[in-house]
A protein has these predicted regions:
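Residue-level detector of flexible, active-site-proximal loop/helix-junction positions
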Residues: 10, 51, 127
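Sec/Tat signal peptide C-region and signal peptidase I cleavage site
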Residues: 13-19
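Short solvent-exposed beta->alpha transition segments
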Residues: 23-27, 31, 41-88
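Exposed beta-sheet edge and beta->alpha loop/turn motif
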Residues: 83-133
Length: 133
């Protein structure tokens, strides 16, 4: 009976840790999206992974890339978190974002855990699903 209790306890703790990761990942993405809406690129930069920060060098370059390459992130209206999928020590978080014109976009955020918490390690715009038949 002790073994069953121990296994149950481990399962509960693992589920709790997973829920905390889910919430932390959503918080990082939401915070960065809010920072972009406020045009606070310095704050948005803090949610980028060390690899992304090395790639762009400074918040200004990073902000210009987002403004020009990800307009639905630069000015976003509504965010809905979809599935979260583990991937080789990282997490892929799909997010439905509506841009300023109300057009929906599905983005996939690659999340990496750092000593400072979860950070965004890349974003891909997924193709829109086909409608009709």
């Amino acid at each position: 009976m002790r073994i069953v209790g121990a296994i149950f306890s481990i399962a509960v703790l693992a589920g709790h840790a997973h829920a905390e990761d889910d919430a932390a990942i959503e918080d990082v993405i939401s915070s960065q999206l809010s920072a972009f809406n406020a045009r606070d690129v310095d704050s948005a930069w803090q949610y980028a992974s060390p690899m992304i920060q090395r790639l762009f060098g400074n918040p200004r370059n990073f902000g210009a890339m987002v403004e020009n390459g990800y307009p639905m992130v630069w000015t976003n209206e509504v965010t809905q978190f979809l599935e979260l999928t583990p991937l080789e020590g990282r997490q892929l978080q799909r997010v439905l974002i509506r841009d300023a014109g109300g057009v929906p976009h599905v983005l996939e955020y690659l999340m990496v855990e750092t000593p400072d918490g979860w950070r965004i390690d890349g974003v891909s715009i997924l193709p829109a699903p086909e409608v009709g038949a």
